[in-house]
Regions:
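Glycosyltransferase catalytic domains, chiefly GT-A lineage
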Residues: 1-391
Length: 391
């Protein structure tokens, strides 16, 4: 019986590992879309037209508009975030989207939004176009990308060889999720530099690329953050005992003396993915420096303080600067919790497919995918030619 149980457990771990590798791969259709749109940028003047048009440029820093920031190299995901936000808005003409992408995706991303106009103001910028964003100003990120321990962490064989008898499938799944290569991408750390990247903005909502907006988000700008910097949904209380049971002890190694000395294991965690930031209040704090300090300390400790991811250093850096907002604004777990309540999904302002099972991937949960796919235009020539099919 013991042998049988061990085999079942090993089978479960193997399934989770395969799922992790599948989630890390770029689907062929999405890769094709990026390549074709990049080619279009080279050959089609319409794909290169200025975004936004010259007369609208002043609105990029107009604080009477609602500014959203999205950082991604996934063109299809970006289109869903933007389309769902605009279609759910009561005043789409007041929306400004600042889409940040990397150098290799820039041409394709620009092509998509130039050729598929929507009733909002769109700006597409590559990381290479931010003069401020140099290695001198963000030296820690070069260290993160080049650190041997991190390369081993993502590419070594120790994941497979870890002692499975000392963990559970639940914990193993969490560890794998933290091993996503996107966590060492500059695009994923970019949100910590919002005040410098957008020096004229007072407030902005930062959205992850694996979300869908289902409700008008303009009331977020009316929330009194009471002098705090980050309006976020807390994740330590709620009916879902897996998704909504996160405290600092779930993210940090409290056997490390620096962690034990500075943090409370019972402190409530909060979510990235849909955050309203008061950039004026943020500029008066040293949040970025704290973030850098703890990233460096974790590297020095050979990743023994936490197992990577961008949330742990943010939990420390924003400590004392978070204002909890109503949980209905942001529903989490659609990428790793297949038992998600569909009725609850319908009521949430923003649903978040955080986890491995992204709606654009083959391992997305079938019953949760239609909420995302309804914002994809499957009649679009580029999408059809890349064989991105509605499932």
């Amino acid at each position: 019986m013991e042998k049988f149980e061990r085999e079942i457990k090993e089978s479960k771990f193997s399934e989770l590992l395969n799922k992790h590798f599948a989630a890390s791969a770029i689907p062929k259709g999405i890769h094709c879309l990026s390549l074709r749109l990049t080619d279009e940028y080279s050959s089609n003047a319409h794909a290169r037209k200025q975004l936004p048009s010259p007369e609208l440029l002043p609105l990029l820093s107009d604080n009477s508009y609602h500014h959203f920031v999205l950082s991604t190299d996934n063109i299809l995901a970006a289109s869903v975030v933007v389309t769902s936000t605009v279609q759910s808005s009561l005043i789409p003409e007041k929306i400004v989207f600042h889409i940040i992408t990397d150098k290799k995706t820039y041409a394709g991303m620009h092509s998509w939004f130039a050729l598929n106009p929507i009733p909002a103001i769109i700006e597409v910028k590559g990381l290479h176009q931010f003069d401020w964003l140099t290695r001198e100003n963000v030296p820690v990120l070069e260290a993160v990308e080049n650190h041997k321990g991190i390369r081993d962490y993502y590419h070594g064989n120790h994941i497979v060889g870890s002692n499975l008898s000392e963990t559970t499938p639940h914990k193993f799944a969490s560890k794998l999720q933290a091993r996503s290569p996107r966590y060492i991408s500059l695009l994923n750390h970019i949100r910590i530099y919002l005040p410098e990247m957008f020096p004229n903005l007072n407030k902005a909502v930062f959205l992850d690329d694996d979300i869908v907006v289902q409700r008008d988000l303009s009331p977020l700008w009316d929330i009194d953050l009471k002098g705090k910097v980050n309006g976020a949904v807390e994740t330590c209380k709620g009916e879902d005992t897996w998704v909504m049971s996160k405290r600092f002890r779930n993210y940090f190694n409290f056997s490390h003396p620096l962690i034990a000395k500075n943090l409370d294991p019972n402190e409530c965690a909060w979510a990235y993915g849909m955050n309203i930031f008061d950039l004026r209040a943020w500029r008066k704090k040293n949040i970025r420096d704290i973030y850098h300090f703890w990233l460096k300390e974790n590297l020095k400790s050979n990743l023994t303080m936490w197992k990577l991811g961008t949330l742990p250093p943010a939990l420390i850096a924003f400590k004392g600067y978070v204002h909890p907002i109503d949980p209905s604004w942001h529903m989490l777990g659609l990428g790793y919790q297949d038992k998600t309540d569909i009725e609850a999904v319908k009521k949430a302002a923003v649903i978040h497919y955080n986890g491995d099972s992204k709606p654009w991937s083959d391992i997305g949960f079938e019953h949760l995918r239609p909420v995302w796919t309804k914002y994809v235009d499957y009649s679009n020539d580029f999408i059809r030619n890349c064989h991105i099919m509605e499932s």
